[in-house]
Amino acid sequence: MTNWIAWAAIEGALTKTKQILFEPFDLTKWVKLAIILFFIGGIGSGSSGNFSSNPFSGNFGDFGNSYSDAELDAFVTETVSEVSVFVHQYMTYIVLAVLVILLVTALFSYISSLMQFVFVESVVRNHVTIRAYIRSNLGNGLRLFILDWTLWIAFLIAIILSMLPALSSALDGDVSALSFGSFIPFFIVFVLGIIILSIIYSFINLAIPVMLYENVGILKALSKVASTAAHSVPQVLVYWIIRGVLGIIIGITAAIISIILIFIAVLIGIAVYMILTLLGFRLFDMSHLLMPRLFLFAAILLAFIIHFVTIPFPIFMRYHALLFLRSWYADIMPFWEPVTEPAPEPVPEPA
């Protein structure tokens, strides 16, 4: 019977997660890990999305009041003209805004790349010291940052190229070209791009420890991981499946925890409001001054609590990947192990 490494690594990941977080519990360590994971993002960051709304739910398919092609062409031409005038009028401000957004995005992206190495060092050694790990991984973070941006720029270029035929026709005023079929290349490129990026980032996730502990660059580490994976295809496929299932389970669990904490926060807010009302405070008289600030403070505090409580999830996932990787590179990662105290020798009974 085949020994699936990814399945066997689950128990070890649970054990190591318990050791780093609860044996013993260290609040300072938790706070440092929360800071690291905040910059990395992912599970525990408190981000969420709402995809339940449908703007077409009421009248989708009702073309009784549809416009003629001539009216649509005129509308598109007028819209393009107005946008062009706006862009030419505020070109300087638009360029400055884009540059600022790109600069801030690049800065946080570099910090996120750098924190990937800080995170690996922290969980491998069970010693979280952010500044020391940052100083020793500035170059590694830059290499990962460059690769990350290269991949996403290539993906963005592919998306733009897939939409060029439809966009060029629309800019020329040919609205009839904007059919569903004209966007099929976009959907194909988008889906294939997401799949390819997911595979690449799965290997990058495994390559980061190789970079750290074999002192090689990102491309060399990726080459080593991909070469080893090519000889263990069934293990890699099972690894991806188990990681996907674990990600779904952890995502659902994190969502449930978030909902429970939000519900508790709402109950606390209602209780505080009722107590203040009974004490004679008229909050609505100052709602325009207090409520926005109180709501913002409460939202930030709640997001931090959710992020803090869900810290074990990304740590477990990182340990799972590291233990899977250790089956390929048994000697490269200096895993911290708990020191067991020797059992006291039995005292001989007096004769």
Q: Which residue stretches match the model-derived regions?
A:
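Helix-coil boundary and N-terminal low-complexity module in membrane systems
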Residues: M1-S182, F186-L192, L197-G251, F284, ...
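Short, surface-exposed, polar/charged, turn-prone segments marking secondary-structure boundaries
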Residues: T150, D172-D174, I264-L267, L276
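Juxtamembrane/transmembrane-helix interface segments of polytopic membrane transporters
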Residues: G251, A255-M274
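Intrinsically disordered, low-complexity segments enriched in Gly and acidic/Ser/Thr residues
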Residues: V272-H288
